[in-house]
Amino acid sequence: MNINSTLIGQAIAFAIFVMFCMKFVWPPLIGAINDRQRKIAEGLNAAEKAKADLATAERDVQQELDLAKTKAAALIEQANKSANQLVEDAKSQAQVEGERIRQQAQAAIDQEINQARESLRAQVAELAVLGAEKILQDKVDVQKHASMLDQLAAKL
């Protein structure tokens, strides 16, 4: 192969083209490549950070759920205790009220029995006086009569 001026001209043109590319074309391409690498690295870092944040958030959510379940169980237990206490209080109040009503009824019965006894005593005394009057055919003195009735009533 012969070296002639065309080959030298082409070599010079190629060298100028390479220098032009190194000076004006290559730096923007390298800058774009570096920017793209940086953006990809930032995206990967952001994805890793988001993944870590997601894991932390899931752990926090699980802890909150566990805490909420514990609180709910405690509230349910407290409500059950309160309900049981209300039932027990109602039972005891009902027993006290029943006892009070029974005592009142017993007192009323006792009072009616006493009234009936007094009424019977008065009737018996009156009948005794009437019987004695008829037997004696004489009226008895009122004060004597009252004292006799009192003595008779006390014996009955």
From Swiss-Prot:
Q: Name one GO molecular function term.
A: proton-transporting ATP synthase activity, rotational mechanism
The keyword Ion transport belongs to this UniProt entry's keyword annotation: yes
Q: Where in the cell is it found?
A: Cell inner membrane
The record's Gene3D superfamilies line, in alphabetical order, gives: F1F0 ATP synthase subunit B, membrane domain (1.20.5.620)
Top-level division of the source organism's lineage: Bacteria
Reply yes or no: does the keyword Transmembrane apply. yes
**Mind telling me which CDD domains this protein's record contains?**
ATP-synt_Fo_b
Q: Pfam families from the entry?
A: ATP-synt_B
Q: Which UniProt keywords apply?
A: ATP synthesis, Cell inner membrane, Cell membrane, CF(0), Hydrogen ion transport, Ion transport, Membrane, Transmembrane, Transmembrane helix, Transport
**Membrane topology designation:** Single-pass membrane protein
Can you list the GO cellular component terms from the UniProt entry? plasma membrane; proton-transporting ATP synthase complex
Taking the first listed entry, what is the main subcellular location of this protein, grouped into a coarse class? membrane
Q: Transmembrane residues, as ranges?
A: 11-31
User: How does this polypeptide assemble, per the annotation?
Assistant: F-type ATPases have 2 components, F(1) - the catalytic core - and F(0) - the membrane proton channel. F(1) has five subunits: alpha(3), beta(3), gamma(1), delta(1), epsilon(1). F(0) has three main subunits: a(1), b(2) and c(10-14). The alpha and beta chains form an alternating ring which encloses part of the gamma chain. F(1) is attached to F(0) by a central stalk formed by the gamma and epsilon chains, while a peripheral stalk is formed by the delta and b chains.
What this protein is reported to do is described as: F(1)F(0) ATP synthase produces ATP from ADP in the presence of a proton or sodium gradient. F-type ATPases consist of two structural domains, F(1) containing the extramembraneous catalytic core and F(0) containing the membrane proton channel, linked together by a central stalk and a peripheral stalk. During catalysis, ATP synthesis in the catalytic domain of F(1) is coupled via a rotary mechanism of the central stalk subunits to proton translocation.
Q: What family classification does the UniProt entry report for this protein?
A: Belongs to the ATPase B chain family.
Note the NCBIfam families from the entry: ATP_synt_b, PRK05759.1-2
User: Mind telling me what this protein is named?
Assistant: ATP synthase subunit b
